[in-house]
């Protein structure tokens, strides 16, 4: 066990300092409002336009520590809800400041670069989620088994604080964070008397920056076991798509962790099975996938090891059913809005040596990505583009818009779906989805003009909608039709549009467009 602790031991000099006094330094707020700093951390989408100030934050923190805690009574619910709203506002301001202080260490390299070059540099902190698929195509086809791991969510606030203790020295900052989360969770339990997940979801919506920092830290701790496996195997390729919550807010991930195996001294499992020579790891949102060439017995040992480790390390009960073992050769898995699988193509080659001919059976593995037709149709039905059977219907709520706006809305949805699922191995199901949207658009226009679809298209011409729903592949075919056959073969193959930076609703069939 001493050898295991050395692998993930983080030196004191490399720990990240949380300087509690920074919260009470006025120049930090001027720094946060600086244009260059805002751009450097992509704050245009993070809400840095909130004009919090040093004086306001100082008063709010003092009031949070000194206030008399109120108790909700059934006779005076309106007054208490008013106080709760004020407290919500206070906590939101404090969380903004806390997240701002947290992001400063990640932004300093870009600020220094701006001063050196005397110009604003916007870091490439966003990656396409489709950058993961080339990794899968190159590597997953050589593997046999897949382990799908569902990371526990939501997380108890105390577990988050305990996780940060391993790489944050400042006790004052941790005390403030613990007190803040404790107050906020209690407050939400009063306002929303539902499950704990509702409280955590409300917290993530009101405090997105702080929530993302805490959640990323939590996921990094869960991935610590995979970092240990990478140290054990030189062939491990650990890749994270970085779409934990649709956008990347971390500029770098913690590569080394402190005392990961602190509590492992209480059990001594035989770790010989982690010597697997070839494994691959990829994660997105709250799902992690680990593929290997190993046997089913090896994967079962991994599952037992993961469950035991996480239960001891996080002091919580980790349900074994959150880890699924799948055979890649005969089972598909849902990944980033695709039904992915490893398909085996069998071919027979006739060979001849010294006048003797014989047949050679070859098996070529290919990574397939299919459009999940049934979940996609369910999403379209939920959004009122078709019924549950997939028959297109009109969109009455859009009938009051102009024709150009109606066509533009349908075109955008169709284009986004076409872009997102451009790398699909088989396009028939994608064409069906596009057909539903196209006919739904025609029915909506016909409903607006109080006519039938046939009469409307006959009056304006059937080419009206074809131009709007022309896919990029059709454009490529028109552009390169007269070019060399090599170009034609390239554009007939799968095309990954790497401008996709988030799952949005396309990757989540349960949500609505």
Swiss-Prot record:
Keywords: Chloroplast, mRNA processing, Plastid, RNA-binding, tRNA processing. GO terms for cellular component: chloroplast. One of its GO terms (molecular function) is RNA binding. It comes from the Eukaryota. Usually encoded in the trnK tRNA gene intron. Probably assists in splicing its own and other chloroplast group II introns. The keyword Plastid applies. This is Maturase K. Belongs to the intron maturase 2 family. MatK subfamily. Its main location: plastid. It is found in: Plastid, Chloroplast. The keyword Cell membrane does not apply. HAMAP family: MatK (MF_01390). GO terms for biological process: mRNA processing; RNA splicing; tRNA processing. It holds the Pfam family MatK_N.
């Amino acid at each position: 066990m001493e050898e295991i602790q050395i692998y993930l031991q983080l030196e004191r000099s490399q720990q990240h300092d949380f300087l509690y006094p920074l919260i009470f330094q006025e120049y930090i707020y001027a720094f946060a409002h600086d244009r260059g700093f805002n751009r450097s951390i992509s704050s245009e989408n993070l809400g840095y336009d909130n004009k919090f100030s040093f004086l306001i934050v100082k008063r709010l923190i003092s009031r949070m520590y000194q206030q008399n805690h109120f108790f909700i009574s059934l006779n005076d619910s309106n007054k208490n809800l008013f106080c709760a709203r004020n407290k919500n506002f206070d906590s939101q301001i404090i969380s903004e400041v806390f997240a701002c202080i947290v992001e400063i260490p990640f932004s300093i390299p870009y600020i220094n670069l701006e001063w050196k070059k005397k110009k604003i540099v916007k870091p490439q902190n966003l990656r396409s989620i489709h950058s993961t698929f080339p990794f899968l195509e190159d590597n997953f086809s050589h593997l046999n088994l897949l382990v799908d791991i569902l990371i526990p969510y939501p997380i108890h606030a105390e577990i988050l604080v305990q996780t940060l203790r391993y790489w944050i020295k400042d006790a004052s900052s941790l005390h403030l964070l613990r007190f803040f989360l404790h107050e906020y969770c209690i407050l939400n339990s009063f306002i929303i008397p539902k499950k704990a997940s509702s409280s955590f979801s409300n917290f993530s919506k009101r405090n997105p920056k702080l929530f993302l920092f805490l959640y990323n830290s939590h996921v990094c701790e869960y991935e610590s076991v995979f970092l240990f496996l990478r140290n054990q195997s030189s062939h491990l390729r650990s890749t994270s798509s970085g779409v934990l919550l649709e956008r990347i807010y971390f500029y770098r991930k913690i590569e080394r962790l402190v005392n990961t195996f602190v509590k492992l001294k209480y059990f001594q499992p035989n770790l010989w099975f982690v010597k697997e020579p070839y494994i691959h790891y990829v994660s997105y949102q709250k799902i992690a996938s680990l593929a290997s060439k190993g046997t089913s017995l090896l994967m079962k040992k991994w599952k037992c090891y993961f469950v035991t480790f996480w239960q001891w390390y996080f002091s919580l009960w980790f349900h074994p059913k959150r880890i699924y073992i799948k055979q890649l050769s005969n089972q598909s898995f849902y990944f980033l809005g695709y039904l992915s699988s490893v398909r085996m193509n069998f071919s027979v080659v006739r060979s001849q040596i010294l006048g003797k001919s014989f047949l050679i059976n070859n098996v070529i593995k290919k990574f397939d990505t299919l459009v999940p037709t049934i979940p996609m149709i369910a999403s379209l039905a939920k959004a009122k583009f078709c019924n549950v059977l997939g028959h297109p219907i009109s969109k009455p709520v859009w009938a009051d818009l102009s024709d150009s706006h109606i066509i533009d809305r349908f075109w955008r949805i169709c284009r986004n779906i076409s872009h997102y699922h451009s790398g699909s191995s088989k396009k028939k199901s994608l064409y069906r989805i596009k057909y539903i949207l196209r006919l739904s658009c025609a029915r909506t226009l016909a409903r607006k003009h109080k006519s039938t679809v046939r009469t409307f298209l006959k009056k304006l011409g059937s080419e009206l909608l074809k131009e709007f729903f022309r896919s990029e592949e059709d454009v490529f075919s028109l552009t390169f039709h007269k070019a060399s056959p090599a170009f034609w073969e390239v554009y007939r193959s799968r095309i990954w549009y790497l401008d996709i930076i988030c799952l949005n609703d396309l990757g989540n069939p349960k949500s609505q467009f």
